[in-house]
Each structure stands twice: as C-alpha cells, then as structure tokens.
Amino acid sequence: MNIFGVGLPEVTVILILALLIFGPKKLPELGKQLGKTLKSLKKASNEFQNEIDQVMNEQDKDESPISIESNQTNEINQEKIDSENSKK
C-alpha cells in the first residue's frame, strides 16, 4: 500500500499518533468529517474540470469554422498566385 508516497509503516505511525492525540472516542468523528471534506473537494474538483472541458469544447466549436474558412481563403490566394506566376 503506497498512497501519496506514504507506505504502510508511515500510515500505522500516523494512525497511532492520531489515536493518542484525539482519543478513541473522537477519532471516528474526525474520520467521518475528513471523509465528508474529501468528498466535497472531489465534487468541486469534478465540477471545475467539467466547466473547463465545456469551455474548451465551445472554443473548439467556435474556432473550427474560422479555421476552415481561413484554409479555403489561403488555398484560393495560393491558386491566384500560382495562376499569375504561370501566366508570366
């Protein structure tokens, strides 16, 4: 078990220290609160990531027609230059 670079011996020491500091009655309550906090942070992180993805998708949709139009314009301009060069 290796979570965040912390192995089993380190986790055991942390749990023993928490038990000594907070006592057996307070530890389950703290664990419950920690779980709620982590769940809330994960939810906020997912919402933030979804918003970023949505903005990126909207931006891609907005840029696509411009890119296609720019490519077509560049092709037309290149054809004009080629035809002018071939006439000379």
UniProtKB/Swiss-Prot annotation:
InterPro entries cross-referenced by the UniProt entry: TatA/B/E, TatA/E
Stated family: Belongs to the TatA/E family.
Key words, A-Z: Cell inner membrane, Cell membrane, Membrane, Protein transport, Translocation, Transmembrane, Transmembrane helix, Transport
Gene3D superfamilies xref list: 1.20.5.3310
Compartment(s) of residence: Cell inner membrane
Annotated Basic and acidic residues bias: 77-88
GO function terms (MF aspect): protein transmembrane transporter activity
Xref: Pfam families: TatA_B_E
Region (Disordered), start-end ranges: 56-88
Name of the featured protein: Sec-independent protein translocase protein TatA
Transmembrane stretches, start-end: 3-23
Domain of life: Bacteria
GO annotation, biological process: protein transport by the Tat complex
Function field: Part of the twin-arginine translocation (Tat) system that transports large folded proteins containing a characteristic twin-arginine motif in their signal peptide across membranes. TatA could form the protein-conducting channel of the Tat system.
Polar residues biased stretches: 67-76
Record text on subunit structure and interactions: Forms a complex with TatC.
GO cellular component: TAT protein transport complex
Entry membrane topology: Single-pass membrane protein
NCBIfam families in the cross-refs: PRK14857.1 (NF011429), PRK14861.1 (NF011430), tatAE (TIGR01411)
